[in-house]
Amino acid sequence: MLNDKQSVENIPRILISADRSSSGKTTISMGLMAALVSRGYKVQPFKVALDYIDPSYHTEITGRFCRNLDGYLMDENGILDVYTHACEAGEKADIAIIEGVRGLYEGFESLSDLGSTAQIAKILNCPVIFVINARSITRSSAALINGYRNFDPDVEIAGVILNNIGSRRHAKKAKEAIEYYTGVPVIGIVPRDPAMQISMRHLGLMPALEGRRRLGDGGFEARLRGIEEIINKGIDVDRFMEIAKSAKALKSPENSVFSSVSDPGAPRPKIGVALDEAFNFYYRDNIDLLNLAGAEIVYFSPVKDASLPEVDGLYIGGGYPELFAAELEANESMRQDIKKASAAGMPIYAECGGLMYLTEKISTGVPGKGTYHDASMPESTYSMVGALPGHTIMGQTRVVSYNIGTLNKDCLLGKKYNSFKGHEFHHSEIREIPEDAEFAITLSRGTGIKNGMDGLISGNTLGSYAHLHGVAYREFASSLVEAARNFRDSRVLP
C-alpha cells in the first residue's frame, strides 16, 4: 500500500482509454478498480469529461467519490486541484485510476487536444492503457496502436487490453501482432461475454442508484462481482499496477479552490440536496465546495420523502425525473412543500432534471421528429412542482454541448456579468413559457431553455439546463451558500 511519507504528487496513477466509445473502457475500468480494492488498495477513481453515470459505478466500487476532470471547463491548475483534493480526501489514495472518454484524442477541437483524454494524460503525466475492441480484427490492431502512438508522441501508451476476444487463436494473433510491430505489451485479454455489459439508458449507462433499485442489492453486487472475476482472469493486475507506479511526479496546484474555508464559528445554513433514483447527477466537488463555503448538506428524496427537511435552500440536480414521473406526481405533499418554499423566497437552484421537476408538468413518450429515448416511456402527462412556468416535453430533441453563459442580473448564482463555462445534456425542451418570463443567463454558446437564454427564474428560484462545476465557476458555492444564509437570517429577524 501507499507509504505514508509518499506525497500525492507521487501516487501511482494510470489512465484507461480507447479508440472510440463502446470499446469496453467502463466495464474494464470497473473490474480493475474492484480487483485492486479486493487486494486492499485505496483506489481513487476519476472520469474524463462531465459524465455523471460512469462515476456513480466507480464510487460504488471503490468507496471513494469519483471526480470529473475536464480540460475545456478547467485550466491545468484546476485539473491538478481536483486530482490532488480527491487523492487527499479521507484516507490518502494508494492509486488513481482515470477512465477516459470516447476516443483518446476526441475533444473540443479538431486541431488541438483541448478537452480530450490525451490532454488529461499529459497534464497528469499519466501512462495510458489502451483498450481495443478486437472483434473481427487481429493484425490490424497493431496498426491501430502504431497510429495512436505516432499521432502524439507525448502521450505514453504503456499497455494494451484486448476486449471482445472470441477465441484463443483470436487472442494469440492479435497479441503477437501488437507486441511484434509496436513493442507495447498486451497486459490483458477480455473474452466476449454478456456479463461485461451494463444496462443502457438514453444518456448512457443506467446510474448505480437505479441499478440497485432495479436489480436489488444482491443482483447488483453479483453483476459487479462477475465483472471483477472476468477481469481477474483476463488481465495481469500486477503488471497494471507496475505501469501505474511508473507515472512521473506531478506539480502541486496553486491557489486551490478547496483551500477557501468559511469561518468555523459562523452559523451554517442548511442546503437540502435532492438525492434518490430520480435525481443523482452531482459533481462531488460541488458538494465539497458547498461544505467548505459554510453549508450543512441535508439530503432528501423527492420520490420517497413526504416533506422537505428544515433547510434554508435547495439544490436539485439532474437525473431522470421523466422515468419516475408517476412517483414524483404521486408525492403531492413534497411538490407542495417545494412550491411553498419557492413562494416564500427560499433560494432554490435546479439543474436540467431538477429544472424539469420544477416546471408545471412533464409529458413523456410524445411522438415527433427527432424523438430519441432508449427507455420505454408511456405517452402521458404528469403534474410537477409548478415553481417555474412551462411544460416539459420529453424526446423531441437531443442536446449535448458545452455552453458559455453570462449572468444578466444578480441572482443566487452570483453577480451580474459573472461568466461561466458549463455543459448541457438532455432530451427534453420546455414549452408554454410566458412571454414575460425572466431568465438570469444569456448564452454565447449552447442551447439553453429558449432563444439562447437559460436560468429561468421566479423570485429566488432558478432552473437551468446548464450544469455547473464549482472548480470551473468558482463563485458557484459561495454564491449559493450566501443566498441560503441570507434567507435563513431573514426568517430569524424580529
Swiss-Prot record:
It is an enzyme of class 6 (ligase). Gene3D superfamilies: 3.40.50.880, P-loop containing nucleotide triphosphate hydrolases (3.40.50.300). The keyword Nucleotide-binding applies. The record marks 467 as: Increases nucleophilicity of active site Cys. HAMAP family: CobB_CbiA. PANTHER family: COBYRINATE A,C-DIAMIDE SYNTHASE. The a and c carboxylates of cobyrinate and Ni-sirohydrochlorin are activated for nucleophilic attack via formation of a phosphorylated intermediate by ATP. CbiA catalyzes first the amidation of the c-carboxylate, and then that of the a-carboxylate. Comprises of two domains. The C-terminal domain contains the binding site for glutamine and catalyzes the hydrolysis of this substrate to glutamate and ammonia. The N-terminal domain is anticipated to bind ATP, and cobyrinate or Ni-sirohydrochlorin, and catalyzes the ultimate synthesis of the diamide product. The ammonia produced via the glutaminase domain is probably translocated to the adjacent domain via a molecular tunnel, where it reacts with an activated intermediate. This is Cobyrinate a,c-diamide synthase. It comes from Methanosarcina barkeri (strain Fusaro / DSM 804). The lineage of its organism: Archaea, Methanobacteriati, Methanobacteriota, Stenosarchaea group, Methanomicrobia. The gene is cbiA.
